[in-house]
Amino acid sequence: MGNLLKVLTREIENYPHFFLDFENAQPTEGEREIWNQISAVLQDSESILADLQAYKGAGPEIRDAIQNPNDIQLQEKAWNAVCPLVVRLKRFYEFSIRLEKALQSLLESLTCPPYTPTQHLEREQALAKEFAEILHFTLRFDELKMRNPAIQNDFSYYRRTISRNRINNMHLDIENEVNNEMANRMSLFYAEATPMLKTLSNATMHFVSENKTLPIENTTDCLSTMTSVCKVMLETPEYRSRFTSEETLMFCMRVMVGVIILYDHVHPVGAFCKTSKIDMKGCIKVLKEQAPDSVEGLLNALRFTTKHLNDESTSKQIRAMLQ
């Protein structure tokens, strides 16, 4: 134990307060089976991010091919540039499916009776850490995807070329790897501004609808509790001093924002209304106290990828804080 400590001296506004050791939490025997399953998925997350970060696209080749439609050599050059990129995009998409299943397994563990979500997070520190790692990955992936228009340009060109060749009764080898059904699913995935967040949101909603005997509050309380965990660690010098690196601080901020966004998509009235169990003002305040260049992307994520920020029920003060 000891990785997740309940804060007995700071019961402020009835929000749960914890310290979660994001750096060292280790699985207990009871957690190990699920932990191993999730770990097998997460071990590929860094290579996915590195591959996405290095993604340059086939813009020049596509442009030359479009401008010179009768030049067969340029058509082939563009096609040969795009095909390996589409295989990479398929890998990213398939990872999202694995992540979806991993999240549902975690939610099952962190919300099941007889324990409350708060008790689960106290007892199952290592699973809580993996949940945080999924959220951290999701925000990083979506940040990179949003900054890279080449992804959709490449895939659109690929689909147009496939359609044109199908009309001419040509079958291309890549169709064995990315068939029409797979291409349709990938197209829907990459059409989203934040595809990984959409995947997590859908996975959470699916989990709620599949577990009708489990109150939705068990799931949303798990999310709001995780937000409080992050917020209290960020605003309390005693806990911040336990982080061994700035990287962990950034991790904690990104997880807090990821959980808020997920909560806002899953909860019927969202994260910003007065009845929300998330202290939105406190969370935004904590972010704004950091170096501006390190949190601008996170503040933008709250501005542009949440669902209920612009609802009438959102207080003017919260909206003003995010302007």
Swiss-Prot record:
Membrane topology: Lipid-anchor
InterPro entries, A to Z: CYRI, CYRIA/CYRIB_Rac1-bd
Localisation per UniProt entry: Membrane
Protein name listed in UniProt: CYFIP-related Rac1 interactor A
Organism this protein belongs to: Homo sapiens
Family label: Belongs to the CYRI family.
Subunit structure: Interacts with RAC1 (GTP-bound form preferentially).
Top-level taxon in the UniProt lineage: Eukaryota
Physiological role: May negatively regulate RAC1 signaling and RAC1-driven cytoskeletal remodeling. May regulate chemotaxis, cell migration and epithelial polarization by controlling the polarity, plasticity, duration and extent of protrusions.
A Pfam short name: CYRIA-B_Rac1-bd
